Amino acid sequence: MSARIADIAHFDGFWTTRPAESRPGQRYWYIGKIDGVINYVRRMSEWTVTAALFEFGPDNEPKPIIGIVHAPALGLTYLAARGAGAVRIHKTAVGEKRDKVVPSMTSSLDGSVLSYGMSFLPGESQRALDVASSLAGRPADIKRVGPVSLDLCKVADGTYDAYFEPMLHVWDIAGIAAGTVVVWEAQGTLSRWDGERIHWRHDNDVVPSNGLIIRELQHYLQQYPWLDSINQR
């Protein structure tokens, strides 16, 4: 993927080899490895390959502006670009089907369908499980499939109404960024659990949503703040 993308004009390099200091307007591709390695190894269909293009803004902070999430085993590809919307391409037996990506209109946690992510680190996983337990009786269902890039896209296309993950690390950036652009361009919302913006050069907790249930959900998320997770690691 990197070799093919290298032929594209108007970008300044790759995220992992970018200089220590970047200038406003510079753009770098981040090519992800397999997102959902455990699913892949266990021959589940829910795994992806991802790519995201970052642009440094006037404040010298990076922001993803193009996102690609490809799930080969599912025959699904999500594409999104800043200001151009998001599209889902579904390969079927009779050809490709292209749909505009739009989130759900669910306006309450009651009867909603949520998804969440977990970590291989016990303290981080416990934080997610605590939130899921506290939500019992509100959503119609809470799913756990992964990976994060696909879960973000499923929030964007209305499969889920929201998703929460307690800790995403720097090695997750490609998948998070690609899925984030899909969410943004579908007019969904995405932030940290405390409502602050994502920091693209640091670890994050994340909560994308359809934008209609985020305040209700954050009431539960904020009962389990970031420092609790860090202290348990």
Where do the PLM segments sit?
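N-terminal subdomain of lithium-sensitive/metallo-dependent phosphomonoesterases centered on the IMPase/IPPase/PAP
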Residues: 1-35, 219-222, 226-233
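Helix C-cap/helix->beta junction micro-motif
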Residues: 8-9, 60, 186
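Acidic active-site catalytic centers that drive phospho-/nucleotidyl reactions
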Residues: 17, 32-35, 39, 151, ...
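Solvent-exposed alpha-helices and their adjacent loops that cap or buttress functional pockets
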Residues: 20-23, 42, 59-61, 79, ...
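DPxDG-like acidic metal-binding loop motif
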Residues: 25-91
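Short helix-coil transition/hinge motifs at the ends and kinks of transmembrane helices
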Residues: 57-61, 92-97, 169, 226-229
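Short amphipathic beta-strand/extended segments with alternating polar/hydrophobic composition
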Residues: 61, 80-81, 94-107, 218
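An extended, acidic
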Residues: 101-233
